A protein has these predicted regions:
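Acidic/polar surface patches and capping/hinge elements
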Residues: 1-195
């Protein structure tokens, strides 16, 4: 599942992404700050997987899932969440991409700076993967869930700790893992659609 390599430090893509983070850092609005802090979810809080489990539980109630159906959704979604963090960290420690504030010390972060490499974004990978499972199970909710995953990823750029290419690679990686899981779901090799 490893994503392709991030852009080189001296490439136009890298420099543009770094400039975007610096521009946000220099002009961060209260709304951007609030968004970054909402999605921060550091250890000791609900965390991104906890957020998506809460969303799944709410959907299970909303659509009156049986215990078996709810268990299936939660199991498949959490399997994807675990695989997402493993795949994301495998890539992080393959590529060793520096954080924006390491590349430009003038960048002020709005949230905690994780002590591991930047590429790809864990939040993006986890959120895209878990949202994709929920979107497959609840197709009428797919657009809303995808938008939340995009927002979770974008929040890390707003917080000053990720580049846009970290986000896009994480979103793609999470969706790829979810697609693989849905294809190989033990329930007849395809996920059931609930609502």
């Amino acid at each position: 599942f490893r994503p392709s390599s991030p852009p080189a430090f001296d490439s136009p893509v890298f420099l543009a992404a770094l400039a975007e983070v610096r521009q946000i850092s220099d002009t961060r609005t209260p709304e951007q700050d609030a968004n970054a802090k909402f999605w921060d979810m550091p250890p000791g809080t609900v965390t991104p997987p906890g957020y998506w489990n809460q969303a799944a539980a709410q959907l299970a109630v909303k659509y009156h899932l049986s215990e078996r159906e709810a268990a299936h959704v939660l199991a498949l979604m959490n399997m994807v969440g675990f695989d997402a963090i493993i795949a994301s960290h495998e890539a992080k420690f393959t590529y060793w991409m520096v954080r924006p504030s390491q590349a430009d010390p003038g960048i002020q972060v709005a949230i905690g700076l994780p002590n591991f490499p930047s590429y790809p974004s864990n939040h993006s990978t986890i959120s895209a993967g878990m949202a994709a499972i929920l979107g497959a199970m609840f197709p009428t909710e797919r657009a809303r869930l995808d938008a939340l995953a995009e927002e979770a990823g974008r929040s890390r750029i707003l917080g000053g700790i990720h580049y846009s290419f970290d986000n896009s690679a994480g979103l793609k990686l999470g969706r790829t893992i979810a697609a693989w899981a849905l294809e190989h779901d033990v329930n007849g090799h395809e996920a059931f659609t609930l609502r």
